[in-house]
């Protein structure tokens, strides 16, 4: 538990963080995969840019508790269905990760191999998104999974996580 609390404290005291996330969104009949470059800010916003696949690279935006804004060229667009009964979009998973690390309800924490696995809820309400985060040997996120009503809906491999 201490490692999760230390990470939270570092994020709250810092100017934010940066990381890349390989995201897979599972809609049951189809899985969408893409890679984002993300920057979490002190105010809680996440600025992102799509890195892969090339067909949607360059799409960027800002995500916050109030919603999001996406910018794209005329020849590119994002069209993902909603996940978790409208609670989550594949792109907003990067904001959910950052927000739950900073303020989510920690429901459990324990060792998992050489690292630590932390389970958090995004709210204190009954229908919360569950976010499982694996911390590496440096106590930084390396993987996250988001569940809705016990079903895995979004997974992220996190690379180059740095606290700013």
Features from the language model and the residues they span:
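N-terminal leader/targeting segments and the immediate start of mature chains
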Residues: 1-36, 40
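Solvent-exposed loop/turn segments connecting transmembrane beta-strands
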Residues: 27-31, 51-57, 125, 151-153
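Extended lipid/amphipathic-ligand handling interfaces
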Residues: 36-40, 61-63, 133-135, 160-161
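Beta-turn initiation residues at beta-strand->coil junctions
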Residues: 50-52, 70-75, 145-149
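A short, polar/proline- and glycine-enriched secondary-structure boundary/capping micro-motif
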Residues: 57-63, 80-84, 129, 152-157
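Acidic/charged, solvent-exposed loop-and-adjacent secondary-structure segments enriched in E/D, K/R, S/T
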Residues: 69-100
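Gly/Pro-enriched, hydrophobic low-complexity segments
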Residues: 107-164
